[in-house]
Amino acid sequence: MMKGLIGYRFSPTGEEVINHYLKNKLLGKYWLVDEAISEINILSHKPSKDLPKLARIQSEDLEWYFFSPIEYTNPNKMKMKRTTGSGFWKPTGVDREIRDKRGNGVVIGIKKTLVYHEGKSPHGVRTPWVMHEYHITCLPHHKRKYVVCQVKYKGEAAEISYEPSPSLVSDSHTVIAITGEPEPELQVEQPGKENLLGMSVDDLIEPMNQQEEPQGPHLAPNDDEFIRGLRHVDRGTVEYLFANEENMDGLSMNDLRIPMIVQQEDLSEWEGFNADTFFSDNNNNYNLNVHHQLTPYGDGYLNAFSGYNEGNPPDHELVMQENRNDHMPRKPVTGTIDYSSDSGSDAGSISTTSYQGTSSPNISVGSSSRHLSSCSSTDSCKDLQTCTDPSIISREIRELTQEVKQEIPRAVDAPMNNESSLVKTEKKGLFIVEDAMERNRKKPRFIYLMKMIIGNIISVLLPVKRLIPVKKL
């Protein structure tokens, strides 16, 4: 084997031992396994002397692999034979299942652990020799004729002799006799010869700075073509940077695909840019201005490096601006209604402003007699909200005011009788209505409710006053 490779060793896993070596051995494919594992009868040899020399592959880890035929103690094949000429292999521990990791974890075999004892069974002396015995379970029982024995030595390495195996020596003589030529030997890598990677030691020893490269020590042969394809790049400066070993050691143009330096004269496209005139306002309520964002690079540069949309023009930035200088309400409504009496003392004004379905009434009144409907002792109160004509409301207020002024001097001179009491009650009712309406003049929605309440009170008090006798003063 490859003796010159440090760390190289023959150490297959349990799955590899079962699936490859033992399975191919039982199926008759000896050419796949004989170069790695030799066949012996493990019960015919003493571990302390013979086993290391019989292994096909010698190991410094003090472990060896063998194919061994299965021998049974009785014809029923229920118990395997474990005794040797000077001792016996004693099973210990529990059997471990070996599963095929690439076959959904199916059990393909088991591994038994045994320790070699010198002497007669069951009394014997334990030795540092341990054996892992691999049995296959994925084949029919009549084909299970061999096991793989992994023998390990747990003692000192000085106690083991490493003489060449007689079988290996005989195999080498057989090859010479058949072919007439000795078996080729594996050689360690020598300077000047190619290794597995297709490189020689001379190529690795040769200094990098002795190779002839016209662009510099760190420029690849295809870098010159790449630089010519770039736009807005200072070719001389880039070559100088890549040629400097101290600044960029070991880098090439293939490692860096982004231009490092942009010429100052390429920024001339920005000289005419004015931030004040970049956006323009229109007289529309909602204005949308679309501007193409200027770029110091051309379309070819963007297509070459970004690869945007298979060569389509680069993205444009959309800028939206809304003009709010002439922002006004959509439906402005403003009106004023003035109510004035003949004497000039009674006046009322209503101002209403509406915007988009929202109204805010503002009512201002000049005197105490306004927003009233005519009421009398025999007539019921009329709803002011049903009157849509302002002239009718104003006329009723004036008539009511004049009637109240005419009744005041009559009430002073009239005698105190039942009729005068009714007049006073009527006057009081009118003043109460007037006073209530004045307090609630800013709440038109409650006018009808107040009129109904006051009318009910008057209608109740009038019959009561007629029944109660009034004493003369």
Swiss-Prot record:
GO terms for cellular component: endoplasmic reticulum membrane; nuclear membrane; nucleus. Residues 108-160 bind DNA. Keywords: Activator, DNA-binding, Membrane, Nucleus, Stress response, Transcription, Transcription regulation, Transmembrane, Transmembrane helix. The chain crosses the membrane at residues 446-468. Residues 340-354, 364-379 have a biased composition (Low complexity). The keyword rRNA-binding does not apply. GO terms for biological process: cytokinin-activated signaling pathway; leaf morphogenesis; positive regulation of DNA-templated transcription; regulation of cell division. Pfam families: NAM. It is a single-pass membrane protein. Residues 4-154 form the NAC domain. The keyword Endoplasmic reticulum does not apply. Transcription activator activated by proteolytic cleavage through regulated intramembrane proteolysis (RIP) mediated by calpain or its functional homolog. Regulates cytokinin signaling during cell division. This is NAC domain-containing protein 68. It comes from Arabidopsis thaliana (Mouse-ear cress).
